[in-house]
A protein has these predicted regions:
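Basic/aromatic recognition patch in beta-strand/loop cores that engages polyanionic ligands
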Residues: 45-49
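Ordered hydrophobic segments in well-structured contexts
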Residues: 38-40, 51-53, 62-64, 91-93
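Domain-level recognition of nuclease-like catalytic cores that cleave nucleotide substrates
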Residues: 15-19, 76-83, 90-116
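Conserved catalytic cores of phosphodiester-cleaving nucleases, focusing on short active-site segments
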Residues: 28, 32, 50-52, 58-71
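Residues at the C-termini of beta-strands that transition into short coil/loop
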Residues: 43, 68, 96-98
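Active-site-adjacent loop/helix micro-motif of nuclease/hydrolase catalytic cores
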Residues: 42-43, 71-80
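Glycine-centered loop/turn motif at secondary-structure junctions
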Residues: 36, 86-89
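Acidic-basic catalytic patches of nuclease active cores, encompassing PD-(D/E)XK
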Residues: 1-44
């Protein structure tokens, strides 16, 4: 499969970025499910993409997860939320997917739907 991650204009590029972000989030959720977590989806506009929860030795393991693909960076609000989590002793994980891994997954393992 041959795919292009560059749009011809800013509107098209924003649409591509949104789809790539959703795909990255789906990959991260699948990985967390494989580790035994339950996924809690949140509304858009939150400081993180989803929360992952599991019980370990009768204790609740809660992780706030922010997923970024390629060269994407966290916003100021997300960085502030990450710092707040660190101060509060709460788990926050930045799940980064390099472009090479995304390309591999798109070519070999997963259905990317209308991204093609």
């Amino acid at each position: 499969m041959n795919f292009e991650l560059r749009g011809s204009n800013s509107t098209e590029q924003m649409d591509i970025n949104r789809k790539i972000g959703r795909l990255g989030e789906r990959i991260a959720k699948d990985d967390y499910r494989n580790l035994g977590y339950h996924i809690l989806d949140v509304k858009s506009g939150m400081f993180f993409d989803f929360a992952a929860v599991r019980f370990l030795d009768e204790k609740l393991d809660l992780v706030f997860v922010e997923c970024k693909v390629g060269n994407a960076h966290m916003s100021r609000r997300q960085i502030q939320f990450k710092r707040w989590c660190q101060k509060a002793g709460q788990n926050f994980f930045l799940y980064q997917i390099p472009n090479e891994r995304l390309r591999y997954l798109m070519e070999n393992e997963i259905d990317v739907g209308d991204l093609r």
